[in-house]
Amino acid sequence: MFLEVADLKDGLWVWKVVFLQVCIEASGWGAEVRDSCGCGDSSSHQTDDPATALALHVACHSFKGQLVQQTLLLGTRPRVWVNNIPQEGPSLPLRQWLLPQCPSLNRSGSAMGTGWGLSGLSPTALSRDGYETETPFSPEGAFPGGGPAEEEGVPRPRAPPEPPDPGAPRPPPDPGPLPLPGSQEKPTFVVQVSTEQLLMSTGGCDKEPPRGQGVDTRGDRTQEGGEKPREQREGPRPEQGPDIPGQQEESPQQEPSSERGDSVGEREARSPGHEGEGGGEWPGISGERRESPGEWGADVPRGRGEGAGEWGSDVPKDRGEGGREWGPEAAQEHGEAARDWTSESPRTLGEDARDWGSSSRDAAGSSPCALRGSLAPERLGDGPWPAWPSPQEREPGPRDRVESPREWGGTESPRGWEAGPREWGPSPGGRGDGPRRRPRKRRGRKGRMGRQLETTATSASATGGPAEEAGASAPEGQAGGGPRGRARGPRQQARRRHGPQRRRGPPQAGEEGPGDATLVLGLGTTSGEQRADQSQTLPALAGAPTAHAHAVPGPGPAAATLGGRGRRGSWRGGRRGGGAGASGGGRGGRGRGRGGRRGSGLSGTREDAGSPSARRGEQRRRGHGPPAAGAAQVSTRGRRARGQRTGEEAQDGLLPRGRDRLPLRPGDSNQRVERPGHPRGGHGAINAPSAPDASPPHHPRRWVSQQRQRLWRQFRVGGGFPPPPPTRPPPVLLPLLRLTCAGDPGASRPGSRRPARRPRGELTPQRPSPFAPQEEGLRAESCVDDGAIAPDTDTASGEVPEAGPSLSSTMCQMGRPRPSPKSPR
């Protein structure tokens, strides 16, 4: 029971006695508590659950100790764990252990003397309560060496309890409310205690609840799920080891309990896959264990069913039943005594299962169960804890190989169970050799950028025909030839990506590249993978100088264009709209092929000058970076080429400017490319940094203006406001509008003149006569009702002509539905 007491009545301290966990093994307590409680408020204690009663009582007494003394310490030596230290009733003065747990100086200043030891607990001096300091329990008083509390009023200074040792294993997490004790003998209120406590408290199994339950087959345990395991947890601790009769005896194989890894840490470390339980406990997984029928027996059902059959008959029952549960024992139980579970993965076990199978224990099956109880809840299959992949799932490795869970995946899979053997990482060989590998992210300068250095002339060839024709001069090609400014080194060039994005290189001369320029360019990719990987490389690679993103691709290490962001490498609009245009603004982002949609006043001629439509020769970029090869549009000749391979033109903006283009910034383009910093020192283009703080502003106000300018530039480049929605001729909109106003989209006649028909059963004022003829619904009526209704139409339809302008559609909404005959349905 956790008793949490916040301000005790006169307590200076708000302390949580979270630790007064009272585990009562005797049953008569409810009554005793009620009787011994003098608080008159016995109704509050009127619960038959002794632990609860005790807690209530204690709370109601502000821990005056009467109760605890009379009750806790009464005849049955209840176990009380305080602060997780199991103590047995009167054998130890409560004060000695309660006190340290609850630091509280009582207000009166007396240390509450040697009151039977709750002195630490009760803010009220015990001596005032009539429990004088001489109590049978400890003449020493709460403070060893202290004698009775010092003169009243002078509390002996007490050090606050030391915080729990961080290294010490924590008590296993509380598994939550115990399920009703199913087959268990009456639940002893067991609280989980950490292994240490158990070690301390139970040297042996003497205090254990009869382990008879140990034999419970798993079924029992599972239904009790939390409780029994808890009990068991409390109970046969592995320390108890074989000596727990019911428990170990059966399994000769059982390892020495010590190995049992019972210390929580050890137990926890064990990979959950501990041996058997894999499948059952982690029901989700069909493991290899399960898979190799031979091993587990062909039939091995997946479920946690009882008995060996579960694992297949050949599996000895022990595995079937309990072993499967991951009792720590079970885990160890296969012969190796000290297998270190942490290092061993279930797979290993998986293989061993056969060995385990041999354990005799299986006959009883019980011990695994019992064990299971003692396992930390993580292992319990039933608990709320997520199942770990079952060991079964792993293919058995050689038995002794120690492997870490990392390896559980296919045996060779470096990445763990998620990936099949070859799933990631470069595969040594050609195309078909494995499941599609994700392109390996290159990290660090050796990855994408460093390569530029190695490629020299090759890059010119690499950048390949179109690139060259696009004016990449070779030197620059080497610097920025690849669209990301990484020259495609010879190796990279060949690197094939089977994914949608084929290569980031400029399209080879004859080759038709992947459809979307963004992919080709490595601009945005759906996964963001490339971009991520570029940005990973950035800082590392670019080195400080280019760290603010305006680095232009250049051969030097500095040349790492950040992530190859294009020359003037700012995210400008995300590489001009790179992936979705940064904030939608990229030039590409706004789909401006041909500038057609730039529907803003800004369109002006800027558009021809700089928009992608102003292609190639006339590239008067007016100082704005390379034309966008945007995600949405790399417009090659002003046509949106979305998804279409837009040949080199798509990229030529990204290719180094050479021959016919004016350099981006005054100065020799190649030279500038090589020295990526801002030409005049200072920051790069204002919008250069991809992250706002990439180039820290030097002046607070400057930052604002930079931002403003950056936003504005994005806006301009991205084409200003999105074009207003096309205006539709009103006749088209009105009927729609009108229907919705009428509130009944199904109304047959859109006219606003009559409110839409309401569903049949609804009460609405109806003019009983004359019903409009049925065909009225079909009658075509002009959608736009100019107000006056031609009476002849109405009379034709049998409707009484109404004078006055018909309500406009809005009026329908405004609640003045005009009464009108409803045609009968």
From Swiss-Prot:
Keyword list, A-Z: DNA-binding, Nucleus
Annotated Basic residues bias: 437-449, 485-505, 565-575
Reported tissue expression: Expressed in neurons.
Localization, UniProt: Nucleus
UniProt GO cellular component terms: nucleus
Sequence ranges of Gly residues compositional bias: 576-588
Pro residues composition bias: residue spans: 157-180, 721-733
Main localization of the protein described in the UniProt heading: nucleus
Keyword RNA-binding found: no
Molecular functions per Gene Ontology: DNA binding; protein kinase activity
Cysteines paired by S-S bonds: none
Basic and acidic residues bias locations: 217-237, 257-277, 315-342, 392-406
Region described as Disordered: spans on this chain: 126-825
Sequence ranges of Polar residues compositional bias: 191-200, 524-536
Biased composition (Low complexity): 247-256, 455-477, 537-562, 734-750
Domain of life: Eukaryota
Protein purpose: Might have DNA-binding ability.
Protein name in UniProt: 5E5 antigen
Native organism: Rattus norvegicus (Rat)
